[in-house]
Amino acid sequence: MSATHHKTSLPQGVRVGTVMRIRGLVPDQAGRFHVNLLCGEEQGADAALHFNPRLDTSEVVFNTKQQGKWGREERGTGIPFQRGQPFEVLLIATEEGFKAVVGDDEYLHFHHRLPPARVRLVEVGGDVQLHSLNIF
């Protein structure tokens, strides 16, 4: 299975009310995929959000990366993704954090550890077929 690697620039950053909509398909043999909200285009840039569905371990991990170091992982309850099935994720910037909505259900509200205004790039990668990435 070939890994997806897609990047979309956000030159204006992220502010309260910004919505990122990711639509795709989880392949039958998928292990993991991720959506990263990065603070720069350089290798090793800080990540304001690392959203990481792990089908191989049936969990979704949320985290940040600052100065090359990962923070404390947070996990949602259950895994709202299934191999061979399409999905829609909304990442919504709020005053408090990033709200992750999968399908019609709020999944987790990840509290800001880095200012969302620093975000410059959305990166989608791993075992996923990306259909669309829209920023509203």
Swiss-Prot record:
A beta-D-galactoside binds at W70, G71, R72, E73, E74, R75, G76. Residues 6-136 form the Galectin domain. Keywords: Apoptosis, Cytoplasm, Lectin, Nucleus, Secreted. The keyword Cytoplasm applies. It is found in: Cytoplasm; Nucleus; Secreted. GO terms for biological process: apoptotic process. This is Galectin-7. The lineage of its organism: Eukaryota, Metazoa, Chordata, Craniata, Vertebrata.
